[in-house]
Regions:
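Conserved, single-site charged/polar hotspot
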Residues: 1-220
């Protein structure tokens, strides 16, 4: 999740529907995939494989919580790109396959990523649903957030974003030194340590995204 933006999301009085058809620019062409496929492909590309994290002392269940947190963050980032701001305005796609947006590489898909992503796509009340994080400072409004994430903060914590009220500075300790990053939103190495320490996916997300809730949206 690598583009910074000054675009401020609009406040809504109800939960929005989200598109199930995603156009992504990959391998020099625009491809259309369903949302779940897009998310598990991003998840496989943006995090290390399961063996890396079990090697750091996480149990299989803890790795699943980490993966699920990243899946929701990626879904949130995607919805912001579709509904609020994209680096690719005027194109027939809103997200590309590089770190300009979210890394998307179908050759790296793992079963663990598919399984974790399946947890955030489900049927409720006869409708297909998926989870994203939304800024919800009051009981009556919902705002999209830039679902930013990055590799590691090296123990320096995250930073305040000037126009994104959900992206506040929080303290953070990494499980290992990663590739660095912009320090906005979810720290992947910090999230791994929080998972190892027993945090659920939802607790990880709500730690890094301030005054937010995990919202169930209908796929359209």
């Amino acid at each position: 999740g690598n583009f910074a933006t000054s675009s401020v999301a609009r406040a809504m009085s109800s939960v929005p529907d989200v598109s199930n058809s995603i156009a992504v620019y990959y391998n020099n062409q625009t491809k259309t995939v369903d949302r779940e496929t897009y998310i598990y492909t991003v998840l496989s590309s943006e995090l290390y494989g399961k063996s890396y994290y079990t090697g750091k002392g996480l149990t299989s269940t803890q790795v699943s919580e980490l993966y699920e947190a990243q899946a929701v963050a990626a879904n949130t980032f995607l919805e912001y790109a579709l509904s609020v701001y994209s680096n690719h305005s005027g194109k027939d796609y809103k997200v590309c396959s590089s770190s300009c947006c979210q890394v998307y590489d179908p050759t790296k898909v793992t079963e663990e990523a598919i399984d974790a992503t399946a947890n955030i796509f489900y049927t409720s009340g006869g409708k297909s649903k998926t989870d994203i994080v939304m800024y919800k400072p009051s009981s009556t409004t919902y705002d999209y957030i830039w679902g930013a994430f990055f590799s590691s903060c090296s123990g320096n914590g995250t930073k305040d974003h000037s126009t994104q009220p959900a992206l506040k500075a929080v303290s953070c300790t990494d499980i290992a030194t990663g590739a660095g990053g912009h320090r906005y939103g979810l720290c992947q190495m910090g999230a791994a340590l929080r998972a190892k320490n027993g945090d659920s996916a939802s607790n990880i997300l709500l730690y890094y995204y301030t005054d937010c809730r995990i919202i169930s949206c209908t796929l359209k």
